[in-house]
Amino acid sequence: MFRLVIFRFFLLLPLMMSPPSYAAWQFLGATSDGTAYLIDPSTKKNKGQLIEMHTMQNLRSARLVNGQKFRSAVGQTLYNCTDKTSATTLIRQFSGELGEGKVVSSFKQKPKEIIWDAILPNTILEKEWQIACVTG
């Protein structure tokens, strides 16, 4: 019996020590249709006057893109802290929730085609900008 307990302990130890893959994601809010918005501050990178971080949308129910269903989208977003603007430069849409499953669609914005959006007050995007530009 004691050996069985010790065996199970060492078998499960790596699982207990490794955090889940979504551990760094912070919930920012949700819309009335149930879409949850998250951000991963651990991906924060300074790029001159810009900050880059990963964002995620997790859908309550699947949507279609190019004839395939997706449940979540992970984006790479740039934040201009001075101008209070943002631009999504990369989007990957996944078949599963929280960025899991297979990539059903991927789109990367070319640098010359980046569209900068103003950050409006009291929005989820403003919460993202605050994490990128205001918090340490």
Residue ranges of predicted features:
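N-terminal secretory-pathway/extracellular module detecting exported/lumenal segments
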Residues: P20-G136
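Bacterial N-terminal signal peptides that target proteins for export
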Residues: M1-F9
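Low-complexity, intrinsically disordered short peptide segments enriched in small/polar/basic residues
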Residues: F2-R3, P14, A36, G101
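Bacterial N-terminal signal peptides
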Residues: R8-S18
